[in-house]
């Protein structure tokens, strides 16, 4: 499922926990192996809310990163979490975790 684009390229925030963004980035390690970083960034102050490093871009990586981010999150805050349309962000399990914690899903357009 593709979520609406709630950010509409407005990457500014006036307070913490208004707008978060996430993606998975591939890096090459010194030994030639690939490492994948999955962070959540708060657009208010560019702080990393949570992150996970993995040797493969899999659901467990995204789930761990997301569960770190929701610890202590007030469901009423209504934070927007924006991503691309990657398969991880379209999963039912991902959308369920967002809904359970009052997070509004947003996706960019291709």
PLM regions and their residue ranges:
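Charged DNA-binding/catalytic regions of mobile-element recombinases
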Residues: 1-110
